[in-house]
């Protein structure tokens, strides 16, 4: 070490001893910016025979147990270098030169296994389940797991891994050495995002040295110093891979790649399945080109996350979908029913309008007085209420005009009924049936046109309407009527009304008639 570096370390040691507790947070914040101090401390740790090693280890332990977060992280950044020095000294069997480093490692370990109240810590980790989403997968992207997902989540099949409680250690032995070191490396990995680049570089170099020392690859790497093999555990190698994996994506591509290859090399020699599985998975996921991430940016492991999708499948049966399906089905049914009723109503109205117009025209032949009023049939129906002025005008009409008008109306009624019959045969087939009389069909929606004269009131015989005969059909087809049969019945009814009107004209002058139209809608 140079004299300047020794002076920086000695100044750091003396400064902390005279520092009051109130200014400790400001001191911890400014400490991480002293790069020259960090470099000098690395050199002190790398020289086991240095006189400054013991006070430096003591100072780092005081930082760690102070409770200040910044001072704790400052100590953790030297942890990989301290482990390497301890393992190197242990491999060379020089136990006396590693006493202060061993004490520091034991002190950090004993502080980490207990909480603030002095109780043992129990660390837990929940292994991700395929039924629940994570940063690596979405359950909906795997496939249709509607039933499987709910079943797995309800049964609670997620596996939880526990670590602890860990026992207190007073000294490091060959039996508990890697148990302590593995836990310390776990604590270091928990604070990886706060570690500077110098610490990540030290981690990668130490991982390579530990894995190749005493093996033929040591000559390829040209590592000097320790030439004996350093025993290592499977769990410790897995923790090394965690730190190396982070360093790959945070500016240390070359060193981390080299360390990854050395870890795979050592795991193959030791036949450790856990580090082989993790290391090969990391290597298979690496990009082909070097990662050029900024050392000053945010430190994190880059993971490609699939876009989130809806957890509810489009084909999933829910209460809303069932309710919507019912609404849609009822809406279609009601719409279809309304359309059918409209179709029937249109047919009924067409059938009724023809028959009603012909019947009304034949019934009004006795009360009409002017040939010019023969085209307005609807107005004559409304005006046939029996006003006195209309009655006087009808009494003064000539006999010849009434006979001529009656003959003409009879011919027109017959021609219109024949035309209606031909049209109905085109639109309605003879096989089409009408609903039962109890339902709202054509039999009830059709108009019932009747005309009562003052002669009927006085007791004169009037031919009965043939409409009741329509429903009196024997046999299995009692409720089925064809369009032709209905038209023929209506034609007979119209012809009878026409003959009756002609006979009444010859006997006496026709009194006013009342025409009522009933339609059940």
UniProtKB/Swiss-Prot annotation:
Signal peptide: none annotated. Residues 355-373 have a biased composition (Low complexity). Residues 355-413 are annotated as: Disordered. The keyword Phosphoprotein applies. The modification Phosphothreonine is found at residue 306. Residues 390-406 have a biased composition (Basic and acidic residues). The keyword Cytoplasm applies. InterPro entries: Hyccin. The modification Phosphoserine is found at residues 321, 415, 422, 433, 453, 465. Disruption phenotype: No visible phenotype. Lysates from total brain and optic nerve (a pure white matter tract) display a selective decrease of Ttc7a and Efr3a protein levels. Induction: Down-regulated by beta-catenin. It holds the Pfam family Hyccin. One of its GO terms (biological process) is protein localization to plasma membrane. This is Hyccin.
């Amino acid at each position: 070490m140079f004299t300047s570096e020794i002076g920086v370390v000695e100044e750091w040691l003396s400064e902390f001893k005279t520092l009051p507790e109130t200014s400790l947070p400001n001191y911890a914040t400014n400490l991480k910016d002293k790069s020259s101090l960090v470099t000098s401390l690395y050199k002190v740790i790398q020289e086991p025979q240095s006189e400054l090693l013991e006070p430096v280890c003591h100072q780092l332990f005081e930082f760690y147990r102070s409770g200040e977060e910044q001072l704790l992280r400052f100590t953790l950044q030297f942890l990989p270098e301290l482990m390497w020095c301890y393992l190197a000294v242990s491999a060379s069997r020089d136990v006396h030169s590693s006493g202060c480093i061993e004490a520091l490692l034991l002190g950090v370990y004993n502080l980490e296994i207990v909480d603030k109240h002095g109780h043992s810590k129990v660390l837990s980790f929940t292994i991700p389940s395929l039924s629940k989403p994570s940063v690596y997968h979405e359950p909906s992207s795997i496939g249709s797991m509607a039933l499987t997902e709910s079943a797995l989540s309800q049964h609670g099949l997620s596996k939880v891994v526990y670590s602890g409680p860990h026992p207190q250690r007073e000294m490091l032995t060959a039996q508990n050495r890697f148990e302590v070191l593995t836990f310390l490396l776990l604590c270091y990995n928990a604070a990886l995002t706060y570690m500077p680049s110098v610490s990540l570089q030290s981690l990668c170099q130490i991982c390579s040295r530990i894995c190749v020392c005493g093996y033929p690859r040591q000559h390829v790497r040209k590592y000097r110093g320790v030439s004996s093999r350093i025993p290592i555990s499977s769990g410790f190698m897995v923790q090394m891979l965690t730190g190396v994996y982070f360093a790959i994506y945070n500016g240390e591509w070359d060193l981390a790649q080299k360390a990854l290859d050395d870890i795979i090399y050592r795991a193959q020699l030791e036949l450790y399945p856990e580090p082989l599985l993790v290391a090969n998975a990391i290597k298979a996921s690496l990009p082909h080109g070097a990662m050029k991430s900024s050392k000053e940016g945010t430190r994190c492991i880059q993971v490609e996350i699939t876009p989130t999708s809806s957890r509810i499948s489009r084909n999933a049966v829910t209460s809303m979908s069932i309710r919507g399906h019912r609404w849609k089905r009822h809406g279609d049914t009601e719409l279809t029913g309304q359309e059918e009723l409209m179709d029937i109503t249109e047919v009924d109205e067409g059938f009724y309008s023809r028959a009603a117009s012909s019947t009304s025209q034949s019934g009004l032949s006795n009360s009409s007085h002017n040939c010019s009023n023969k085209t307005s049939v609807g107005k004559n129906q409304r005006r046939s209420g029996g006003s006195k002025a209309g009655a006087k005008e009808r009494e003064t009409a000539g006999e010849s005009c009434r006979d001529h008008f009656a003959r003409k109306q009879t011919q027109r009624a017959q021609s219109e009924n024949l035309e209606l019959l031909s049209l109905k045969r085109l639109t309605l087939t003879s096989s089409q049936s009408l609903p039962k009389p109890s339902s709202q069909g054509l039999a009830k929606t059709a108009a019932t046109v009747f005309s009562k004269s003052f002669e009927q009131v006085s007791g004169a015989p009037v031919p009965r309407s043939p409409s009741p005969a329509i429903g009196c059909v024997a046999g299995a087809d009692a409720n089925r009527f064809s369009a032709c049969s209905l038209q023929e019945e209506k034609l007979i009814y119209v012809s009878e009304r026409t003959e009756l009107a002609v006979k009444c004209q010859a006997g006496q002058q026709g009194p006013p008639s009342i025409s009522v139209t009933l339609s059940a809608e």
